[in-house]
Design a protein with these regions (language model features):
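Nucleotidyltransferase catalytic core that binds NTPs
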Residues: 1-173
Length: 174
């Protein structure tokens, strides 16, 4: 939830798509995230904003005077610098002029941890490539019933063809 009482949370989903690192298209990502987190489904923003600047402009145009952006720990410094550098500046991305811009980390992952704590999108993609549904399922929230469908969608979007077990062949025709 928002850091300040009465704050509204918006979740902006990446529009990026490529077979290797971002296999799902935007609409599919939004649909899966809404299913994974039904309590926050209305907070998942379907906005054309594709960059941090476009997100900031979108929020400013909605009347927000202050923002707290939560991002991966590896992006905090970069996003804080960029958002503050262009705050109050008319540029090609548009204009935003917030009283306060704060960028905070979504938290650090322990890559060596087991289960959800150590899970990452990279590990989930790797499990999908390896055909390891059980490991893939460790990366989805408890209660999410479409893990196998998500797994198949990720594999398909990565260009991985499903293999069917045809059984053993022990007799040959001449």
């Amino acid at each position: 939830q928002g850091k300040n009482a009465g704050s509204k949370m918006h979740v902006f989903v990446s529009h990026s798509q490529d077979a290797k690192k971002n296999p799902l298209d935007y609409k599919r990502k939004v649909a899966y995230i809404r299913k994974m987190f039904p309590k926050y489904a209305k907070n998942i923003t379907t906005d054309k904003a594709k960059t941090i600047f476009e997100v900031a402009v979108s929020l400013y145009n909605r009347g927000y005077k202050s923002i707290v952006m939560v991002v991966g720990s590896d992006r905090v410094d970069e996003f804080e610098r960029l958002l503050n550098e262009y705050n109050g500046v008319q540029s090609k991305h548009g204009y935003y002029g917030f009283d306060n811009v704060e960028v905070v980390s979504a938290g650090d992952r322990d890559p060596d941890a087991e289960g959800l704590e150590g899970m990452s999108a990279s590990k989930m993609r790797s499990a999908a490539v390896d055909g390891d549904l059980d490991s893939f399922k460790q990366g989805v929230p408890d209660g999410f019933n479409d893990a196998e469908k998500l797994y198949r969608d990720v594999r398909k979007s990565m260009g991985i063809r499903e293999e069917k077990d045809m059984g053993e062949m022990d007799t040959y025709e001449k």
